[in-house]
Amino acid sequence: KAIRAAGSRAQLVTLSNNASGGFVKALGDNAPGTIITQVFPNERSITSPLVKEVLALAKAKNITDLSPAMLEGFTSAKVLVEGLRRAGPNPTGDKVRAALEGIRDFDVGGLSLSYSPSDHTGLDFVDLSIIGRDGKFRR
């Protein structure tokens, strides 16, 4: 808001952790046109196995609109559960870390996720979305 209040018309770009309705609401009239990096497929992409899986679970809870943050949270939970499973029946922080760092080509709904002791990136997927005049994320 401060950038716009200062009169700047610069194109604003932010990270995926700001891909939420709360962020859009906080920006108010300044939200449209803001570009957000996305590390997951479009939440309306019904061809994505990940989106299909999340949509099915959301429908069961009467949730009709998915957000980019929901896809990230769901995937993070899925990866954590896999790390705990691989860590064994008595997980410790060290065991969970080693288990997560041993994940290679783990399918998280059509996306391949890998970690190593030196690379915690996970996914190589990147896309961009822009906030529309209606406050929705567009691709």
Go through each PLM region and give its residues:
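Extracytosolic ligand-binding ectodomains
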Residues: 1-139
